[in-house]
Amino acid sequence: MRNRLILLPGWGLGVSPLEPLANALHGLNEHLRVQIEPLPVLDSSDVGEWLDELDATLPDNVWLGGWSLGGMLASELAARRGERCCGLLTLASNPCFVAHDSWPHGMPAETFDAFLAGCHADSQVTLKRFGLLCAKGAADPRGLSRLLVSGAPNTPPSVLMPGLELLAQLDTRAALQAFRGPQLHLFAGLDGLVPAEAASDLLALLPDVEVGLIEQAGHAFLLEDPHGVAGAIQAFLYECVDD
């Protein structure tokens, strides 16, 4: 099923931000089957449980990809599946979402802790703030933020919190190093959630994979320019299949 790509969304905003990209990819290659799968709905932030759910739900021998948290989970699942995964692509996915000593270019821990507390107190207000950060760096940040938040499912805090806690726990560096299939990782130069410097850090960690930086774009670049992103993905897929 080398003509099938599974895309996983980011935290809190549902599948709608990925739909324009999926349509653009299909427009470029009618033989490519693009499937957007929602994140698991679990009351646990245990990484293994999330991966077990995804592994049981998603088909084998496909390309795995995702945006932000979805890309982090796709990375872990690709490493788990090994040769049962055709390849991996991530969009605005930091190997470590929260910064720490060995990975300084992430969200400051105190900022993340405030997010976590805010989500516990009022998840809808926190989601709006998250939407604004996703739209930071866009040509029309307010319009993009409204689009992101308006398309988000009405998710209770009990479902949002485990995903947010998962963001803080995940460190995909070992998974990315272990996965031997082709990889493409795209970052944004004006991202308000994933510092642009993470792109060069990842390239230093994985010098043999493709890492791209879209200079004038924010975290939701897949929604800002779905056709441009689709073109980069299609070129990557074509190159890998051609090899």
Predicted features, each with a name:
Residues C85-G118, V159-L160:
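Flexible "cap/lid" loop of the alpha/beta hydrolase fold
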Residues A217-A230:
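Catalytic histidine-centered segment of alpha/beta-hydrolase-like enzymes
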Residues S16, G192-A198:
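Conserved alpha/beta-hydrolase "acid-adjacent" motif
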Residues H120-L170, A174-A175:
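Conserved alpha/beta-hydrolase catalytic His-Asp/Glu region
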Residues F179, H185-F187, D191:
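Short beta-strand/loop motif that positions the catalytic acidic residue
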Residues G66-G70, A74:
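Gly/Ala-rich beta-loop-alpha elbow adjacent to hydrolase catalytic centers
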Residues L8-W11, W67, F187-A188:
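The conserved beta1-alpha1 loop
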Residues M1-V47:
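Conserved HGGG/HGGXW glycine-rich cap/lid loop of the alpha/beta-hydrolase fold
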